[in-house]
């Protein structure tokens, strides 16, 4: 069964995901560390996982399965989901795949090292680019594409 798991605490595309899931009549697990507002319609279940920093990630990784979709920008969580045969669509719409997750993990580690070095010598590094309307549009298109691919068994 195709379910969508949202790593929800900082996800900017929750409402968009709800609308797409409603159109396809899919169940959505909104996984967060604190209560969030749910849409009035659809098959959305809020899962509040208090505790450790990675509690939401662990809940998703333990339950996601082949053919499910994760909505997350968390690269280590994306890797865990891909390892279980799930598909991963981050909010920017640039899908994580088995072919590109290694490079994403390496880039993340490099940026983490650069931030630590910059902090040590007082240098400021720019953060990620702001979330844009183009990102939102690309996310909607990619989520739709992935849902249809999973339904066709691809």
From Swiss-Prot:
Domain of life per record: Bacteria
NCBIfam families hit by this protein: PRK00124.1
Pfam family, any one: DUF188
Family: Belongs to the UPF0178 family.
UniProt-recorded name of the protein: UPF0178 protein RC1_2062
Species of the source: Rhodospirillum centenum (strain ATCC 51521 / SW)
HAMAP family, per the entry: UPF0178
């Amino acid at each position: 069964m195709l379910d969508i798991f949202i790593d929800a605490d900082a996800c900017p595309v929750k409402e968009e995901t709800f609308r797409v899931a409603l159109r396809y009549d899919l169940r959505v697990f909104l996984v967060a560390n604190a209560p969030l507002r749910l849409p009035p319609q659809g098959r959305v279940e809020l899962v509040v996982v208090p505790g450790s920093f990675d509690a939401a990630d662990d809940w998703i990784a333990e339950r996601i399965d082949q053919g499910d979709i994760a909505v997350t920008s968390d690269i280590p969580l994306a890797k865990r989901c891909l390892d279980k045969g799930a598909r991963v669509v981050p909010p920017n719409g640039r899908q994580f795949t088995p072919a590109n997750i290694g490079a994403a993990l390496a880039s993340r580690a490099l940026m983490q090292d650069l931030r630590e070095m910059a902090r040590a010598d007082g240098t400021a590094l720019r953060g990620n680019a702001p979330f844009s309307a183009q990102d939102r549009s690309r996310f909607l298109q990619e989520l739709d594409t992935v849902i249809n691919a999973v339904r066709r068994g691809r």
